[in-house]
Amino acid sequence: MKRIAVISLLAATALLGSCRFVTIKDSESSLSKGVSASETTRKADEEKIVNRYDVGEFDSVVCSGAFDINYNSGSCEVKVEATERDMEGLKVYVEDRTLHMEFTKKNLLGKKSDIDVYMRSDTLNSLEINGAAEFDSHGGLKAGKQFNLTVNGASDIEIDSLEAEFIRINTNGAADAKIAGINASELNIQVNGAADIRLAGKTVSTQIEINGAGDIDTSHLQSESFSKRVNGRVVR
């Protein structure tokens, strides 16, 4: 009799050892089999962190990547908000008064990301954007004698006011730019590709060259002298 009881107990123990228990708290709870851990990891990957960069003085910017850039005039400052994953391989540095923002080879230039950049400088004389970035300067920007804007790729540019003696704009690709409050002696625009550019303000002289399916709206731009060489469309 004791032998039967011992055998039964051993069998029950073996059965219990082979069972896999799943705890269900309620209809809104997750199963306790690793799902909550993966959800926690995913949420951690989605949470943004803030990095501030002590880069020194700069008056030119070169950005290569899918950034969402907010620019204002003021003391030089660079702040980046992104997930830890998107921060990987990000390089931010100043060389010869030019702020560079770029990724290492481990990251793709135009990969989908959600990287918010907040930057300030006393003046901005040159801006170059490579990739599918967004650049907004709702407070406008101050330039020196000359301002150069170069856009390579499908970036969106919005500048509320821009003042310089000479302004040069060069786009290659499907750029979308809206620049208002222009105050310049000379404005020179060269478009290669399918850019969509809207301009407003005042200039003494304006020269436009389009190669491709570019579309430039200058209906709100006052200019004493206007010349164009176009293989595209200019709305005047």
Give the location of each predicted region.
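Intrinsically disordered, low-complexity terminal regions
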Residues: 1-236
